[in-house]
């Protein structure tokens, strides 16, 4: 992974998170349909996240996280450092927003039930999309994809870090807990893993051609109707809005990344690079925090959804709030990982981590 490729993937990651934000903002109940053209691209951005995730996970498992302990702690800290604040924010804003404008919180806008405690508990264990379940932690619709992502992490860890009987048992248990709906999109995530493994197989002189071909393929696909070209079977056993389009888009994104890895990427100035890195660091927080903020500000900001002032304020407050909170949360990931490592070592009766020993001696 070169510095340039890492930077460009960071830009793609933030771009995908911003696309999801705009797609949710563009709904009629929030903005009166402003940017309606981008509404259906939110799901496409999530599929891009899956491919990027598979690529990055394959990379770190070969470089920085080469043991099950290191990998598991990193994934756990990555997820829960944002999930816990997101749960608190969602519960708080939902309760206030519902009291102000119940219409924005009807069942047609989210997968709500009459048992919010169970919803949050199942979501915390990533069981909200298992088998035929469709449960969310309050009105936080983007959380659906984390149920998929977390189980892909588990299945990958079982396949890479375990051997023999434990590997088979772990894969079977994870598969049964995840259920078929989550497994349907596993090939999209694995396309990212394949992109990492096969990136060096492409002759460098073909990298630019592959990039152009992928961009042209995506433009042509969307020009002819995009996901509307594909049959969308409806079943509780399938992911939401599932179609063969998911696999086509996933393949295009994976091939695009392989192309990026095989061209000479220009590096921007240091100031711009730092900006991209900082924004990319907020991507996960932006993704998971923006929806409750959009709902909340959609309820409290006065005026009709299609009013100019309402549109500007809701967009600015929700985006600024999500980015600001994400920038505060992101640094906690490293601290949480260190705390989890200490707790794990105590639980297993292992010596404390070196950092803890140094702290005690100082």
Language model features with spans:
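Hydrophobic alpha-helical transmembrane segments of multi-pass integral membrane proteins
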Residues: 17-20, 50, 84-88
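Alpha-helical transmembrane segments in multi-pass integral membrane proteins
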Residues: 1-8, 15-18, 22-40, 58-70, ...
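Alpha-helical transmembrane segments of multi-pass membrane proteins
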Residues: 73-86, 160, 281
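Membrane-proximal lumenal/periplasmic loop motifs of glycosylation machinery
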Residues: 35-42, 107-111
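Membrane-interface helix-loop-helix regions
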Residues: 58, 79-150, 154, 249-261
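Generic detector of well-ordered alpha-helical packing
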Residues: 11-14, 48, 150, 331
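Hydrophobic core segments of transmembrane alpha-helices in multi-pass, intramembrane catalytic enzymes
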Residues: 43-53, 148-152, 184-192, 249-253
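Transmembrane beta-strand segments that form the barrel wall of outer-membrane beta-barrel proteins
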Residues: 170-180
């Amino acid at each position: 992974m070169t510095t340039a490729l890492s930077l460009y993937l960071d830009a793609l990651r933030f771009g995908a998170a911003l696309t999801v934000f705009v797609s949710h903002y563009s709904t009629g109940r929030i903005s009166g349909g402003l940017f309606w053209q981008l509404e259906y691209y939110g799901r496409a951005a999530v599929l891009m996240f899956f491919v990027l995730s598979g690529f990055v996970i394959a990379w770190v498992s070969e470089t920085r996280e080469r043991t099950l302990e290191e990998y598991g702690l990193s994934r756990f800290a990555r997820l829960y450092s944002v999930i816990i604040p997101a749960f608190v924010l969602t519960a708080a804003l939902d309760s206030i927003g519902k009291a102000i404008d119940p219409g924005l919180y009807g069942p047609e806008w989210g997968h709500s039930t009459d048992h919010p405690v169970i919803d949050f508990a199942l979501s915390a264990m990533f069981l909200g999309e298992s088998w035929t379940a469709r449960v969310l932690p309050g009105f936080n619709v983007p959380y659906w994809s984390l149920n998929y992502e977390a189980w892909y992490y588990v299945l990958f860890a079982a396949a890479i870090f375990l051997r023999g009987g434990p590997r088979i048992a772990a894969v079977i248990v994870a598969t049964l807990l995840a259920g078929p709906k989550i497994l349907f999109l596993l090939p999209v995530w694995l396309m990212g893993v394949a992109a990492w493994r096969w990136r060096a197989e492409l002759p460098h002189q073909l990298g630019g051609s592959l990039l152009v071909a992928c961009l042209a393929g995506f433009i042509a696909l969307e020009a002819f109707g995009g996901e509307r070209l594909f049959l969308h079977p409806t079943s509780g056993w399938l992911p939401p809005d599932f179609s063969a389009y998911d696999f086509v888009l996933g393949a295009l994104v994976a091939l695009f990344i392989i192309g990026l890895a095989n061209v000479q990427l220009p590096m921007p100035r240091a100031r711009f690079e730092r900006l991209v890195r900082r924004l990319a660091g907020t991507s996960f927080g932006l993704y998971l925090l923006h929806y409750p903020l959009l709902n909340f500000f959609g309820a409290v900001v006065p005026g009709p959804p299609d009013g100019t002032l309402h549109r500007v304020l809701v967009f600015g407050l929700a985006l600024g709030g999500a980015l600001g909170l994400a920038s505060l949360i992101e640094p906690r990931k490293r601290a949480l990982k260190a705390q989890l490592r200490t707790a794990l070592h105590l639980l297993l009766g292992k010596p404390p981590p070196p950092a803890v020993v140094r702290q005690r001696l100082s």
